[in-house]
Each structure stands twice: as C-alpha cells, then as structure tokens.
C-alpha cells in the first residue's frame, strides 16, 4: 500500500502540470474561435465587396444602355438643355360618330357630334414628365347645370425610339344630330338639334416604334424636350388596343326619323375590343431657324371582337371582323431651347363594320401652348456661362 504522505507529495508535484494542460487546451479553443471569427469577417467583407462590385457594374451597364437607347445624331437633333419646364395650354376636344345600316342603295346614315369642348391648363414638367391641372372654360361662366360632364384623361410619352399613348374618354349628353342621309325625305330642318340619346366610353393604348430615331425626333414636335435642327423623316410601326362602349337610344330621335329608321339601327348597346397593327411615316420639316413642323400618318389593320345588345355577334367568316383604323398627328413649334410656343393636333379614327351595321367614330385634340425651360442640366451649365 502506498503511504498517504507519498500520494499527497505526488499530487502536489503534478498539480502545476494539470493547470498547464488545462490552460493550453483553453488557449487552443480561444485561438480556434478567433480564427473562425476572423475567417467569417473576411468572408463577409469579401462578399460585401463582391456585391458592391456587382451593383456598380450593373449601374454602369444600365446607364450605358439608357445612353445608347436615347442616342441621337447631334447634327440633326439637339437634346434638352434644362431639367424643369413651365407651360400654359389651351386645348379643344372634338368627337364625331356616324351610324349606318350598310344596306346598299337603301343605306341610312346618322351623324352626331357635340359642341367643341375647350379647356385651359397649367403644367409643370421635369425632363419628359409633365403634370398639370386643366379646367373647362364653360365652368367659369356657369355652363349648363343639366349637362353630364365629359371625362378625358391621357398620358403621352414621346422618347427618341418609341412613343406610348394612354387615353380614357367618356362623353357627356350634349350631342347634336348634325346630318341625316338616306331617308325618303329631306330632314335639313332637323340638323343641329340637341340629342341626348348617345353616350360612349373609349379607353386604350397605342405604342409605336421609330426606326430613324437618331435623326428624327418626335419629342421635338410634341413634347418640346429636344430641338430638330435639320429636316428628317422616319418609318414607324405600332400596335394599339382599345375598348369601345356605345349606348344609343333611338326612341329619342324625332318621330319622323324614327318612323323610317332601319331595324339594324335600333340597337341599344355596342361593345367591341379593337386590336390593331399599324405601319406609317412621319416627317419633321425645319423650315426656319428654331422652327419645325410635323406630319405623321399611322394607318392600321384592326381585328374587332364585338357584342351587340348583350349578345356575342358571331359571323361565319372572321375576315369580316377586319377593319381599318387611323392615327393622324400634325404639329408646328418654335423652340429656341429656352422658350417655346406651338400647336399640335392628334386625331384617332376607328371603323366598325358588320353586314348590316357600321359605326365610325373619331376623336381628336387641338393644343395651343407656350412655356419656358429653366434650371440647366449639369452637363450643359458650362456651355451656357
């Protein structure tokens, strides 16, 4: 048996070595932990650097794409030199409807249109975005309290390569019967009488591509965001989609007209959707310094899916659902980069035809405006000093 005194003596001798071993193990764990944390930190920093690099690269690529997308030939087009714009506008709205029965020599046609609507507007713009407020001139003088107000909303985007038109129109009840044709007697005495039996709603979108965008500028003629320096033209291709709802109460026609009215014109509601592909041409004519005039025509072939009086209108041949649409634009502008004044007209025409019924509706806007640009862009400030 080992004496207790010897055992105690051995434990005292081994105690420092036990402490050293424990401290060594603890130091090893601490070292491993610090190494792990260091690796994690380095990994996070490296990942952050990679993300920042990707973001910078993506940002540069996007800026390059935008720059290339809006590239222009500066011999033909001068870019907008300012950030902000202020504009006053006078606009006149027009619409027209022709209803016909397509019965050969017995064809009947009724033409309706309201009085021209006039509005005044104030606009504030940042680059190519314009926001403003318009009001009806008749409202300033009281107007007709019983008249249902029209609703017109539109958004036009004119860039160097493409353009987009978004619009919504809802007519009031102030139509007039402008002409009556194809009846057995002359109804000249009924021309221009008030007719509140016609209402319509139209909403849609037009999108078009400009092929010669480096030399031909739509914004120069319609949004004053560039200046056309030399005459140039371009072919254009476009697509449009629109929905049309027409309500017609023939019972509100004069009795003498209603008595002879064809059965195909005694409908109550027409609803149709129009899908159209178009191809046309536009030309900017620079006829004097800082002056440009534009004329563009974009005819289209449209397919129309219709519903009459809540019944789907089906025909044996789909080719009979193919009709023609037309978009016309014209403008004249004076723009010296700082101040501008001009006028423009945009006219939409839609043609709907079935074996016994036709509806041709058109609407357009005449704008007369004046304004000025301010706050020069950073890249052009030195050239203006």
State what each model feature region is.
Residues 109-113, 117-119, 177-181, 189-203, ...:
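Extracellular/periplasm-exposed beta-strand and loop segments of Gram-negative cell-envelope proteins
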């Amino acid at each position: 048996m080992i004496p207790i005194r010897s055992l105690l003596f051995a434990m005292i001798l081994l105690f420092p070595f036990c402490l050293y071993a424990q401290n060594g193990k603890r130091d090893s764990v601490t070292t491993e932990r610090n190494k792990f944390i260091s690796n994690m930190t380095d990994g996070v920093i490296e990942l952050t650097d990679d993300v920042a690099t990707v973001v910078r690269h993506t940002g540069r690529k996007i800026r390059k794409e935008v720059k290339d997308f809006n590239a222009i030939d500066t011999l033909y087009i001068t870019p907008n030199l300012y950030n902000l714009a202020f504009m006053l506008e006078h606009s006149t709205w027009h619409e027209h409807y022709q209803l016909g029965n397509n019965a050969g020599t017995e064809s009947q046609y009724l033409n309706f249109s309201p009085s021209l609507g006039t509005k005044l507007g104030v606009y504030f713009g940042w680059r190519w975005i314009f926001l403003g407020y318009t009001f009806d001139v008749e409202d300033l003088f009281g107007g007709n309290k019983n008249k249902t107000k029209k609703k017109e909303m539109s958004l036009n985007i004119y860039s160097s390569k493409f353009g987009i038109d978004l619009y919504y129109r809802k007519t009031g009840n102030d139509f007039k019967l402008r002409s009556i044709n194809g009846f057995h007697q002359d109804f000249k005495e009924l021309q221009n009488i008030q007719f509140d039996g016609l209402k319509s709603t139209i909403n849609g979108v037009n999108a078009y591509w400009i092929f010669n965008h480096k030399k031909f500028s739509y914004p120069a003629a319609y949004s004053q965001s560039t200046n056309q320096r030399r005459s140039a033209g371009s072919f254009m291709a476009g697509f449009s989609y629109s929905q049309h709802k027409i309500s017609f109460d023939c019972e509100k026609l004069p009795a003498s007209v209603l008595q002879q009215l064809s059965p195909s014109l005694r409908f109550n509601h027409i609803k149709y959707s129009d899908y159209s592909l178009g191809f046309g041409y536009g030309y900017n004519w620079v006829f004097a310094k800082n002056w440009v005039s534009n004329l563009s025509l974009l005819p289209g072939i449209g397919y129309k899916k219709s519903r009459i009086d809540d019944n789907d209108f089906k025909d044996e041949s789909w080719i009979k659902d193919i009709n023609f649409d037309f978009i016309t634009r014209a403008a004249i502008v004076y723009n010296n980069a700082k101040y501008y004044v001009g006028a423009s007209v945009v006219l939409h025409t839609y043609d709907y035809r079935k074996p016994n019924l036709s509806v041709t509706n058109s609407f357009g806007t005449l704008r007369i405006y004046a304004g000025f640009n301010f706050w020069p862009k950073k890249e052009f400030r030195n050239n203006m000093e």
